[in-house]
Amino acid sequence: MAGIARPFIPWIGSKEKLIPYIWQVFPPNPKLYLEPFGGGGALLLGMQPKISRMDIYNDFNCDLVNLFLCARECTVQLVRELKFIPFHSRAEFDLLKEFMKHKELLQQRIADERNAVMECFSGEEREELLEILRERSRLFDVQRAAAYYKVCRGSFSGTTTSFGVKPNNITNFLYLFDDASKRLQDVVIENKDCLDIIRERDGPDSLIYCDPPYFDAESLYAVDFPKEKHEELHHILSQCVGYMIVSYNDCPFIRSLYGDFYILAFRRNNPLSQKAGATYGELIITNYDPRPYIQPQFSMFPAEIENGDLVLVHEPACGSLREIYLRRREHETDKNDAPTGAGGEAGNGREMSPGSNGPDDGDGDRQAQYPPDQPPDERSGGT
């Protein structure tokens, strides 16, 4: 499968190997694509950019966002810094982690120096000194990004918490930055709370792909995401009018929580297990009926899930939540716009039918694209 770029950073829960499954349920031609839990950005980096579509990468991890910004805007400086920083042992790994811990102090020092320049100098002298400080700040951002990258690359499965014992030659991966930098030129990069940006960017023509920390596996992530946060995420997504796709681990709690969504399941090899042949259950959850987009070999009937099979395991009794909310919005618009008639009822809007096949938005006639902006002959293979 030919993609624009590959992830340049190892990341716990990376979806690079799952792209063939997730892209199958992508509706074509959204006007906005958002990843609120950006992580390694495997899906977004692999998508063809499109003038008519805004792509947004978001993550709450400020170090990760800084790395993506530097990869886009300071690629040459970042690669040079990565070649310079030594990295051969646990001691160097721990030293880089210690540097990351004190980044706030270094940022505060730069801010204090800037304030001193503003107070003590004026005119051309002030501007010259401010430019020096701006360059120093950019250099610090690059140094910080390089340190964070090496901590990720040197840790077990990209967790950033424990040192990986395998030999790791950073220079073998630097070529990934070239393509990633070009792809990110067309991407808006944000550092916001996942729920806030979903609320901000939801719309009828939006496609939002969520890859939250997996339930009961939060200890593997560098962010606190308790059970209540999973429930809050579901609450927000259940009220969205855009196309929502969510990836999760297969467990009873998530199946129950998303009982009002369509749920597809499959099994994959488990890279975190030390047992040969170990597999892991995955869910792909949507607020719309995914079947019109999926390739013919997809199974629409609940069955014993073999490794690699994509199976629809749950269909909500109420039908598509997205269609329900779109109809509700249309109903309210008709009701507000229509004049009051002789019968005394304002705006006889269409009756909502939660169990119907949804609004006439052409979903059933659309052809699956893999991904939406790539031709069918690129559907085979994996990244």
Question: What are the language-model segments listed below?
Answer:
Residues 31-98:
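SAM cofactor-binding core of SAM-dependent methyltransferases
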Residues 226-331:
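Long, positively charged, glycine-interspersed low-complexity recognition regions
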Residues 2-18, 28, 72-218, 235, ...:
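SAM-dependent nucleic-acid methyltransferase catalytic core
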Residues 39-41, 176, 248-252:
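Short, polar loop motifs at secondary-structure junctions
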Residues 47-50, 200-203, 253-260:
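Short loop/helix-cap segments at secondary-structure boundaries that form the rim of catalytic
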Residues 337-383:
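Mixed-charge, low-complexity intrinsically disordered regions enriched for alternating acidic
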Residues 4-51:
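An N-terminal domain-cap segment
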Residues 22, 33-47, 57-62, 68, ...:
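Conserved proline-anchored active-site loop of SAM-dependent methyltransferases
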